[in-house]
């Protein structure tokens, strides 16, 4: 900080330098992110509510009402009447909140070290949970499809089992665990089941909409206790906009603490100060697009994913790990180390990410990516393959 302030022109000159260092979603070259270019309609709403703080909802009654309407809409999307929850910073916070609730419920009747049953495919946010909440991990094996091997679950449940986690749209491969079967096991053993649908939550319902071949992952599964769903992924809301939905009000109330100096006497979130702009943007987009609008957005992305998969699948040097269920394609190339391939693609201006298990290249087909971007990517990939032969 300077002793004296600088001119606005001088400050913004530097801002432009920083801004030009950033990748832009509109370039179509960000192929490894689950976030995307925000919908301009949502951005307009975001700016309109930029001053709001849902940490003090009595001051911002309209914004607080919008949050409840958003939670009701998301609950309806996930087949739950009378949902409880919040719009939060993202999937990590939502997952932590769910695990906090699970631990508090566990501690009502247990004194042993709590155990969390989760797959190797779980998002890294659960590693934060293990440390923050002093929880012991119990990893359930994956089957040949890289999904939870549900046959192994009953043997892993003990008196110390705090919760189980299932994934609807794994971060690395975009796969959906057998939530209906996991739900039956959770309900049978009385275990809290959290579904991380940060990615799939804004995809699967619109794939299912007016479609008889439905993926079942939500509160229709009676053993599901809570679901993470992120509007700032396929919902096109600006970052940060995550969501956590609980089946029962008593679950959310487990997070309640007194806030005597604010306009409301309690909070049920981890974060205190909480922007209302994300809620306003999400409310706007849910109303603006509706089910039909989001169905079109999702179909466009899935069609592009299928197109990309088919093109890659025809390349004899490329091995695709799993036929995509959502909008993620993971692959490797013969005779090229995965880390080397990532760096070589980056040299051509393509930002792809790596999956850890299995260790492969990971493409995420989000709404900012167009067919012409994929065609350009495939040309560059082929050039790299030929150079490495």
UniProtKB/Swiss-Prot annotation:
One of its GO terms (biological process) is methanofuran biosynthetic process. The keyword Lyase applies. The modification N6-(pyridoxal phosphate)lysine is found at residue 233. InterPro entries: GrpII_AminoAcid_Decarb, MfnA, PyrdxlP-dep_de-COase, PyrdxlP-dep_Trfase, PyrdxlP-dep_Trfase_major, PyrdxlP-dep_Trfase_small. GO terms for molecular function: aspartate 1-decarboxylase activity; pyridoxal phosphate binding; tyrosine decarboxylase activity. Transmembrane segments: none annotated. Its cofactor is pyridoxal 5'-phosphate. Pfam families: Pyridoxal_deC. It catalyses: L-tyrosine + H(+) = tyramine + CO2; L-aspartate + H(+) = beta-alanine + CO2. Pathway: Cofactor biosynthesis; methanofuran biosynthesis; Cofactor biosynthesis; coenzyme A biosynthesis. Its EC number is 4.1.1.11, 4.1.1.25. Keywords: Decarboxylase, Lyase, Pyridoxal phosphate. Belongs to the group II decarboxylase family. MfnA subfamily. Catalyzes the decarboxylation of L-tyrosine to produce tyramine for methanofuran biosynthesis. Can also catalyze the decarboxylation of L-aspartate to produce beta-alanine for coenzyme A (CoA) biosynthesis. This is Probable L-tyrosine/L-aspartate decarboxylase. It comes from Methanosphaera stadtmanae (strain ATCC 43021 / DSM 3091 / JCM 11832 / MCB-3).
